[in-house]
Each structure stands twice: as structure tokens, then as C-alpha cells.
Amino acid sequence: MTLVSDAMIFAACAHDGMLRKGTNVPYIVHPAEVAAIASTLTDDPEILAAAVLHDVIEDCGVSGQELAQRFGARVAALVLSETQERCGDPRMTWEARKRAAIAQIARGDRASKIIALSDKLSNMRAIRRDFERDGESVFARFHQHDKRRHAWYYRSCASLLKDELGDTDAWRELNEHIGHVFSEDDAESCLQEAAYAG
């Protein structure tokens, strides 16, 4: 069994019974799509394994030590680079967690940025599909209901990923989805909020 297929089986077991927010879609569809997107950017099996495992620490209670023992230290480190800490009321901590995630992207190497781009693109594909069907109500399924804050987060991520990966089809697709879902007004409002808060 290859590292990537072993990681896929592990992730499928870890996410068993979980659904994507506000849908009946099995959660494993998301990490599988993240790995598929990452495979257009690299053939490194450790990056692809980490891509499919990227949510198992954050969402499934798997430890970094367990991942390191099973898949190696680099895979575990890459998954940890994609892991957002949660504490207390998620609505109270959303912005702090997203700021930490943005900081992780900023200091990450190319491997971690490939996973971050793949994750954000998978998420934006789902948001766009649901936005086109359900409109603004799509944001009610998230802990953070304010569309402008999501605009700030995804635009910030795309901006940080541009230098390393802006010449890729994946980045261009991410940027196109962001432009479609989030108007310039949403982004401008969020920039003003961030400047005021900063």
C-alpha cells in the first residue's frame, strides 16, 4: 500500500459519519478533493498524504504524534501547519483562529502552501456552488455568519499564496471563485474593519 492510499483510508476512517457543514455530503469528499487538487501541483507523496489528512487533528482528535508514528514527521508537520486551534465559543474565536491561519500561510514553505491553496480552493468551490443555489444564506451554516469576514479571510489567503503559486491554474481558479462570490464592496468593508481593529 502506498503512503497516499494508506492516508486516504486513515482519513476515511477518522472522518467516518461526518458531513460537510449544512449538507448531506460525506466529509471525506473534501480531503479527497484537496489531495486531488494538490496532485495538480506536486507529485510528492508526503504532501499528498498530508493533503488528505489535513483535517484529522483539527476535527477528529487525532494527535500529531500518532500521525508522525504512522506517516512520518514531515507529514505530521504539514498537517499541523494546516491545523487551526479551537477553544471556547467558536463564534468568539473565529477571527483569532483565521488570523493565526493567515500567519501560518505567511511563514509556510511551498509544501504547506500547496496544501493551503488546495484546501481553500476546495472550500471556495463548495461555497460558490451553494452560493449560486442558495444566495447569501450559505453563510448561515458557518460559525461566522458575516460574509464580509469570509471575504477578508479568503482574499488574505489568496494574496499570501500568490507569490509562490500565483502562476498555477489552482490559484487562478481560487481567485476567480473569490471574485465571483465576494463583491469588491465586501472586501473593502472588511479591509476597513481590519484597519480599525489593527
What are the residue ranges of the model-derived segments?
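Active-site helical microenvironments for divalent-metal-assisted chemistry
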Residues: 1-198
